[in-house]
A protein has these predicted regions:
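N-terminal metal-binding scaffold of metallo-dependent hydrolase/deaminase domains
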Residues: 1-38, 49-50
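Hydrophobic "anchor" residues on beta-strands that sit immediately upstream
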Residues: 54, 112, 204
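Active-site gating loops and adjacent loop-to-helix segments of metal-dependent hydrolytic enzymes
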Residues: 65-97, 134-156, 213
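Metal-coordinating catalytic core of metallo-dependent amide/deamination hydrolases
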Residues: 124-215
């Protein structure tokens, strides 16, 4: 595909007028003000503005299914009375369709990549593979039991399996993070063990910090 004589906002904010942008194999293969040689297939000409895609740096994308479920509640009531009980009933199939819905909404608004933390992650991976978007995906991990270690949690086995099977998948569009849910839902020793797992695989960590006060509404 070739975009001809379009205006391009570049990643550094610079403006390129009457530009040509060539796409091959799903990637930008040419950017310049001279028409590139060769056959680029379909051509879209003029009166277009091309901008870099947006990156959504924190999502729980299957939670599109919970939109509007528990408005005007304090954070603790929203989580404990609505969200956690609802999530206990979710299936992998629910997570897959909720992910596809959220991904469709992101793509429609120009978001090309997102960073997600949830569970049934293999179904989120499936939705990402099928949709063409890019994503960092992590198995969200929390622990309220003072006697269980990280290795004893189901999330540990899930995280290792995700790292083994999905990191670098979909032609490199999918990366895997190690994802403690938040500092207030995960003990310090488990956070340390998760950091060690991330270091073992050379991947990033993704967590929630600076959470709103329990008194504030969501």
């Amino acid at each position: 595909m070739l975009f001809s004589e379009v205006t391009v906002i570049q990643a550094d904010g610079g403006l390129l007028s009457k530009a040509y942008v060539g796409i091959r194999d799903g990637r930008v293969a040419y950017l310049g003000t001279q028409r590139p040689a060769g056959d680029w297939g379909e051509e879209l000409r003029g009166e277009l503005l091309l901008i870099p895609g947006f990156f959504n740096s924190h999502t729980h994308v299957p939670m599109t299914l919970l939109r509007g479920y528990g408005d005007d509640m304090t954070l603790d009531r929203w989580l404990n009375d609505r969200i956690f009980p609802f999530e206990d009933k979710l299936t992998g199939e629910d997570v897959y369709w909720g992910s596809l819905l959220g991904i469709a909404e992101m793509l429609a608004s120009g978001t090309v990549s997102f960073t997600d933390m949830y569970y049934f992650c293999h179904r989120i991976v499936q939705a990402v593979e099928e949709s063409g978007i890019k994503a960092n995906i992590g198995r969200g991990t929390s622990c309220f039991d003072p006697d269980r270690t990280f290795r004893e949690l189901p999330a540990y086995a899930d995280a290792r399996e995700l790292l083994r099977t999905a990191h670098g998948a979909a032609q490199g569009r999918i990366l895997v993070d190690v994802s403690p849910h938040a500092e207030y839902t995960t003990r310090p020793d488990i956070l340390a063990d998760m950091a060690a797992l991330a270091a073992e695989y050379g991947v990033r960590m993704h967590t929630q910090i600076g959470i709103a006060s329990w008194r504030e509404r969501v």
